[in-house]
Curated annotation (Swiss-Prot):
Short name of one Pfam family: NADHdh
Record text on subunit structure and interactions: NDH-1 is composed of 14 different subunits. Subunits NuoA, H, J, K, L, M, N constitute the membrane sector of the complex.
Protein family according to the UniProt entry: Belongs to the complex I subunit 1 family.
Membrane topology recorded in Swiss-Prot or TrEMBL: Multi-pass membrane protein
GO biological process terms held by the UniProt record: aerobic respiration
General function of this protein: NDH-1 shuttles electrons from NADH, via FMN and iron-sulfur (Fe-S) centers, to quinones in the respiratory chain. The immediate electron acceptor for the enzyme in this species is believed to be ubiquinone. Couples the redox reaction to proton translocation (for every two electrons transferred, four hydrogen ions are translocated across the cytoplasmic membrane), and thus conserves the redox energy in a proton gradient. This subunit may bind ubiquinone.
UniProt catalytic activity: a quinone + NADH + 5 H(+)(in) = a quinol + NAD(+) + 4 H(+)(out)
Main subcellular localisation: membrane
TM spans (from-to): 15-35, 88-108, 117-137, 159-179, 191-211, 239-259, 274-296, 313-333
Assigned GO CC terms: plasma membrane
EC number annotated for this UniProt entry: 7.1.1.-
Keywords: Cell membrane, Membrane, NAD, Quinone, Translocase, Transmembrane, Transmembrane helix, Ubiquinone
This protein's name: NADH-quinone oxidoreductase subunit H
Length: 333
């Protein structure tokens, strides 16, 4: 359907169809993220020997996150007097919009994808970097030293870990011969790239956690050092924009890992009778669980350790993986 609409002449009908699909995707993602946050809180509670949310919406706390969202929407919208008002208002939108834009190219099954473009992987990496501009803008516009430090940390962290993140997937591009995410999944029909590219997977996973600003790389919003980091002065629905963008990226990155390294919707061996959507959901859930496990387990590292690890460890390993992959492809494929 999407391909037909893209190839048809421009018209107001097509515009409203695309607009309706975009709004539908927005609400679907927001609903998923709402309960994804609840799932994370329950898993963290289990790992820490707690029950987690258990009051609002029954014993499982099914409406806890919904109540939290309503609370944020009803809070007073305050803007500091000394803040740069236009940029302060614009920053959450700049951080929020790209988070949804990247989901357009993720193939969840062979038939369920919003837009199948030839350079889906390049598009994801390029668009995801825009969020950092929103974070830095919010930190600077707040006219608060803690916010500014958080924004500067976010920029330094993104620059340091975007490079090994990109380098780690070059091995996959060499093997698949394409930047199209559907073709990368198709190339894993016999063997998943996590087994062919174990070094690339480890580098990508670590760099992805750093890009998401999650523990142990959550320096831009380190509560014990910077109050709340770049969104210290934000409250209500503007703060919710930053939070939602963080979690949409979290689930988007888990989807990308599933596509690049775990074969997407490809089944395991003789279990092909199980629908591809189920396989994607299982692999995606495993990656999400692993990332939550990281958050609960590891302590935050220091800023100098973060920079050294990115430039002196991950980047050389990612470069070595490219040469190793090229050599293997030349000799055996």
């Amino acid at each position: 359907m999407i391909e037909t609409l893209l190839q048809s002449p421009s018209s107001w009908t097509n515009f409203f169809i695309f607009f309706g699909l975009a709004v539908l995707l927005l609400f679907a993602v927001l609903g998923f993220v709402t309960y994804g946050i609840l799932a994370e809180r329950k898993v963290m509670g289990f790992m820490q020997g707690r029950i987690g949310p258990n009051q609002v919406g029954g014993r499982f706390g099914l409406l806890q996150t919904v109540a939290d969202v309503l609370k944020l929407l009803l809070k007073e919208d305050s803007i500091p007097k000394a803040a740069d008002k236009p940029l302060f208002i614009l920053a959450p939108v700049i951080a929020f919009a790209p988070a949804f834009m990247v989901l357009a190219v993720i193939p969840f099954t062979d038939k369920f994808q919003f837009a199948d473009i030839g350079v889906g992987l390049l598009y994801y990496i390029a668009v995801s970097g825009i969020t950092t501009i929103g974070v830095v803008t919010g930190g600077w516009a707040s006219n608060n030293k803690y916010s500014l430090l958080g924004g500067m940390r976010a920029a330094a962290q993104m620059i340091s870990y975007e490079i090994p993140l990109v380098m780690s997937v070059i091995g996959i591009v060499l093997l698949a011969g394409s930047l199209n995410l559907n073709e990368i999944v198709a190339a894993q029909e016999k063997v998943w790239y996590i087994f062919v590219q174990p070094i690339g997977f480890v580098v990508f996973l670590i760099a992805a956690v750093a890009e998401l600003n999650r523990t142990p790389f959550d320096l831009p919003e380190a509560e014990s050092e910077l109050v709340s980091g770049y969104h210290t002065e934000y409250s209500g629905f503007r703060w919710a924009f930053f939070m939602l963008s963080e979690y949409v990226y979290f689930f988007g990155m888990a989807s990308l890992i599933t596509v690049l390294f775990l074969g997407g919707w490809n089944p395991v061996m003789f279990l092909g009778f199980i629908p591809g959507a189920v396989w994607f959901a299982l692999k995606f859930s495993s990656v999400v669980f692993l990332l939550i496990w990281f958050r609960v387990t590891f302590p935050r590292i220091r800023g100098d350790q973060l920079m050294e690890f990115g430039w002196k460890v991950l980047l050389p390993i990612a470069l070595a993986n490219i040469f190793l992959t090229a050599l293997i492809k030349e000799l055996f494929f």
